[in-house]
């Protein structure tokens, strides 16, 4: 939790429309939905919403990896998420 608060301070200074901020926002939503779904396993609407958000984040990360690999690596490390699989 402390790591997220430090990251949130960093991202508040950046532009809200940036790819990094959007990925950060989606990551927070994903973590909240994941903890919700651990308690409510049969909440299928939330499961669908989680899958949609995961897809959006995956597309944004793929775009960032293609455009700027250094910023992509930094963001992955800061948010503590795995690198997307490439074909």
Curated annotation (Swiss-Prot):
Q: What is this protein called?
A: Small ribosomal subunit protein uS15c
GO cellular component annotations, sorted alphabetically? chloroplast; ribonucleoprotein complex; ribosome
List UniProt keywords, sorted A-Z.
Chloroplast, Plastid, Ribonucleoprotein, Ribosomal protein
Location relative to the cell: Plastid, Chloroplast
InterPro entries the record matches: Ribosomal_uS15, Ribosomal_uS15_bac-type, uS15_NS1_RNA-bd_sf
Q: Which organism is it from?
A: Atropa belladonna
Q: Which PANTHER family match?
A: RIBOSOMAL PROTEIN S15, BACTERIAL AND ORGANELLAR, SMALL RIBOSOMAL SUBUNIT PROTEIN US15M
Record's keyword annotation contains Transmembrane helix = no
Return one Gene Ontology term, BP aspect. translation
